[in-house]
């Protein structure tokens, strides 16, 4: 793979946070001038690399904005991914907890799943008991979608496997009748 492909892969993986110039120079093992030239020569049909201060971010070109808006609208109607379901379960059973708590439990970055859950209104970030970081908690919409009146109504491991299966089946179909 050439340096353009590696750079694109790194920035894609970093997501919205991008990568600091120093990180890129170290990972790519090149000079600042080489990095600047690499970025200037980067060409993609729908993507571009933008610099914000000392951070580089892979972004979409402005010409694609109307299509991206349509996709976002459609995606907001889509079901939850496996990762989002896992994160939602972790939050529901352990709330309040921080993003770093979720990462400790899952051993993987969960920012994308958390952002999805917040965008869908199933989770919100709040300052709880003067904690330094925001804590994630489920919302009333979460209760409504899953047909429970309070968080204590979540099935526990002592309950029937059938009841647990029914709950998670409802979770998979979370955009159903309960959310119109």
Swiss-Prot record:
Gene3D superfamilies per UniProt: Winged helix-like DNA-binding domain superfamily/Winged helix DNA-binding domain
InterPro entries according to UniProt: ScpB_csome_segregation, WH-like_DNA-bd_sf, WH_DNA-bd_sf
Pfam families assigned to the protein according to its UniProt record, in alphabetical order: SMC_ScpB
Compartment(s): Cytoplasm
Function: Participates in chromosomal partition during cell division. May act via the formation of a condensin-like complex containing Smc and ScpA that pull DNA away from mid-cell into both cell halves.
Family to which this protein belongs: Belongs to the ScpB family.
PANTHER family, sorted: SEGREGATION AND CONDENSATION PROTEIN B
NCBIfam families named among the record's database cross-references: SMC-Scp complex subunit ScpB
Protein name: Segregation and condensation protein B
């Amino acid at each position: 793979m050439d340096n353009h492909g590696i750079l694109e892969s790194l920035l894609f993986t970093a997501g919205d946070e991008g990568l600091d110039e120093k990180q890129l120079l170290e990972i790519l093992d090149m000079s600042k001038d080489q990095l600047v030239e690499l970025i200037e020569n980067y060409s993609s049909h729908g993507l571009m690399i933008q610099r914000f201060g000392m951070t580089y971010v892979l972004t979409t070109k402005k010409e694609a904005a109307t299509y991206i808006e349509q996709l976002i609208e459609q995606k907001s109607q889509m079901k939850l991914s496996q990762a989002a379901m896992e994160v939602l379960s972790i939050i529901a059973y352990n709330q309040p907890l921080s993003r770093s708590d979720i990462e400790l439990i899952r051993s993987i970055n969960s920012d994308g799943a958390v952002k999805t859950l917040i965008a869908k209104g199933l989770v919100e970030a709040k300052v709880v008991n003067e904690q330094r970081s925001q804590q994630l908690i489920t919302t009333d919409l979460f209760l409504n979608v899953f047909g429970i009146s309070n968080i204590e109504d979540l099935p526990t491991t002592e309950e029937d496997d059938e009841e647990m299966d029914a709950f998670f089946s409802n979770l998979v179909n979370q955009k159903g009748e309960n959310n119109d």
